[in-house]
């Protein structure tokens, strides 16, 4: 993923190989550290992992696979200054990615893999890590908008 602080544009590219022909991907931008009231709690409550935007359809986008089962998808999103009355702080935001079966089919509601990466890297761009998901033959790598890997390999 790449994030431009001046334009607030986030770009996420996901590449991999699916082992299931009927695979979907869901990508969600979340925010943590939101202090607000909550029903049933007294005083202020810290809300974490609150969904801010879906980069895909809520039930996922069907992955278009080539003959070998490979896929590449790219999403861009401009983070707004606020959602409702709450400030959007990119340094408190993550992108969560799930590769899964067809949520509409009760027999296929499996999540094959999932991971998340911070919108704003916690390290310098030279040391930034790519996000990869590994389950069977599924992996996800994050590339910048020029389709260059963010770093050489996963460090998680």
Label every PLM stretch briefly.
Residues 129-152:
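Surface-exposed, proline-anchored Ser/Thr-rich loop/turn motifs
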Residues 1-127:
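Short, conserved sequence motifs used for protein processing/export or organelle targeting and
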Residues 20-24, 150-155:
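Solvent-exposed loop/turn segments flanking beta-strands in beta-repeat/beta-sandwich domains
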Residues 117, 123, 147-149, 153-154:
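Intrinsic disorder/low-complexity segments enriched in polar/small residues
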């Amino acid at each position: 993923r790449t994030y431009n602080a001046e334009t607030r544009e986030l770009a996420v590219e996901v590449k991999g190989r699916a082992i299931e022909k009927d695979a979907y991907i869901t990508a969600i931008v979340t925010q943590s550290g939101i202090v607000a009231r909550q029903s049933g709690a007294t005083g202020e409550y810290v809300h974490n992992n609150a969904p801010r935007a879906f980069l895909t359809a809520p039930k996922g986008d069907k992955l278009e696979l080539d003959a070998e089962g490979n896929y590449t998808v790219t999403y861009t999103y401009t983070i707004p200054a606020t959602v409702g009355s709450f400030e959007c702080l990119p340094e408190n935001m993550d992108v969560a990615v799930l590769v899964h079966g067809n949520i509409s089919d009760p027999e296929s509601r499996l999540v094959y893999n999932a991971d998340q990466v911070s919108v704003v890297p916690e390290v310098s761009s030279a040391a930034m890590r790519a996000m990869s998901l590994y389950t069977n033959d599924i992996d996800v790598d994050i590339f910048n908008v020029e389709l260059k890997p963010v770093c050489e390999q996963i460090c998680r």
